[in-house]
């Protein structure tokens, strides 16, 4: 298959991804059964003071204003409490290039197919580094530990191994092998992935040709995973475990204690030769109060973008930790 056909396959995946609509799930639990259309986990949890969220919003506003005065051109932040559902955002609907963030919803779509066709996970696919141009390589400035990635060029690997490498190492070669397979070699794969991606609803369906994403929409994927509302419980746990194993440590993870698990996916993109975008989104498993946090940035310097993400992560964790005491 030529690189042009692979690129076309990627475009199909992106267009399918862009056609998303919302996902609605009813939650009913014995301990709080008076609600039919909202999550009783939220309704029955002790409410946190409104002033706390106002304070967090003010702190984030101040930090973002300072960061954009100091060389970072744009920052967006979205925080959501996973116990009660309250959220705080700064520039939460601004559009960014999704870049490698797209890997997560595509992985979820393929795993959802595997829930009906388990044999897909053992199907072996070629791992071919010659299938991509150098422009798809992750910049050296984005440091992450790739030593554990044992996939070798020219060999074949099960789909499950490629799915894991796509999330743990953000492996572009594994990702494009999956896209090629699902678009060309799996009967009805394009349509099945399309239906799955529609349920995730993370890109504005009013303009499906736009390959853009906001912190608010993208962070919804992690809430859906946390609630096992898209995949079953076992597969939700499996995907989140892969995300916790992710080897990019200079974003959200750098802002929290080393003992705190973080299920994270980062994305990076260089536009017009100089303009850079770096994003990191995920679930921070604070021991008393887990939350989602999604941060997207634009600027001219990788170091400044990484620092911005890690400092916002630290700010939010400190605020959550102080509330939990």
Which sequence ranges carry the predicted segments?
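Structured C-terminal helix/loop/strand segments within mature extracytoplasmic catalytic/sensor domains
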Residues: 3-67, 87, 185, 226-249, ...
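Active-site-adjacent helix/loop patches that line small-molecule binding or acyl-intermediate pockets
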Residues: 37-56, 125-238
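Sec/Tat-exported extracytoplasmic proteins
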Residues: 64-71, 108-118, 129-131, 167-173, ...
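Short, conserved catalytic-motif segment at the N-terminal edge
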Residues: 68-96
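Solvent-exposed coil/turn segments that connect beta secondary-structure elements
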Residues: 80-84, 93-95, 112-113, 130-132, ...
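Active-site SXXK
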Residues: 85, 97-128, 134-136, 166, ...
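Short amphipathic alpha-helical face segments that pack within enzyme cores
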Residues: 104-109, 217-220, 311
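His/Asp/Glu-enriched short active-site or ligand-binding loop at hydrolase and phosphoryl-transfer sites
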Residues: 251-254, 260-264
């Amino acid at each position: 298959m030529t690189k042009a056909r692979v690129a076309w396959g990627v475009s199909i995946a992106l267009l399918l991804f862009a056609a998303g609509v919302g996902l609605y799930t009813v939650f009913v639990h014995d301990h709080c059964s008076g609600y039919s259309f909202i999550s009783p986990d939220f309704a029955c949890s002790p409410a946190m003071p409104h002033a706390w969220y106002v304070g967090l919003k003010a702190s984030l506003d101040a930090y973002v204003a300072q960061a954009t005065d100091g060389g970072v051109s744009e920052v967006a932040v979205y925080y959501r409490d996973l116990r009660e559902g309250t959220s705080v955002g700064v520039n939460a609907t601004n559009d960014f290039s999704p870049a490698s963030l797209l890997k997560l919803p595509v992985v979820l779509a393929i795993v959802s197919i595997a829930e009906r066709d388990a044999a897909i996970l053992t199907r072996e696919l070629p791992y071919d580094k010659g299938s991509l141009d150098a422009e798809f390589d992750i910049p050296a400035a984005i440091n992450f530990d790739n030593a554990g990635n044992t996939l070798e060029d020219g060999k074949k690997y099960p789909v499950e191994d490629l799915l894991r490498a796509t999330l743990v190492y953000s492996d572009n070669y594994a990702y494009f092998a999956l896209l090629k397979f699902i678009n060309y070699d799996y009967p009805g794969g394009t349509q099945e992935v399309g239906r799955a991606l529609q349920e995730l609803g993370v890109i504005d369906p009013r303009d499906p040709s736009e390959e853009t994403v906001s912190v608010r929409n993208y962070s919804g994927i992690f809430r859906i995973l946390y609630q096992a509302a898209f995949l079953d419980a076992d597969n939700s746990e499996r995907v989140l475990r892969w995300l916790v194993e992710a080897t990019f440590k200079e974003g959200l993870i750098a802002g929290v204690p080393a003992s705190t698990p973080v299920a994270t996916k980062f994305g990076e993109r260089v536009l017009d030769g100089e303009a850079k975008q770096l994003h990191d989104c995920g679930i921070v498993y604070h021991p008393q109060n887990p939350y989602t946090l999604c941060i997207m940035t634009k600027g001219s310097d990788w170091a400044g973008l990484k620092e911005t993400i890690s400092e916002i992560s630290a700010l939010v964790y400190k605020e959550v930790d102080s509330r939990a005491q």
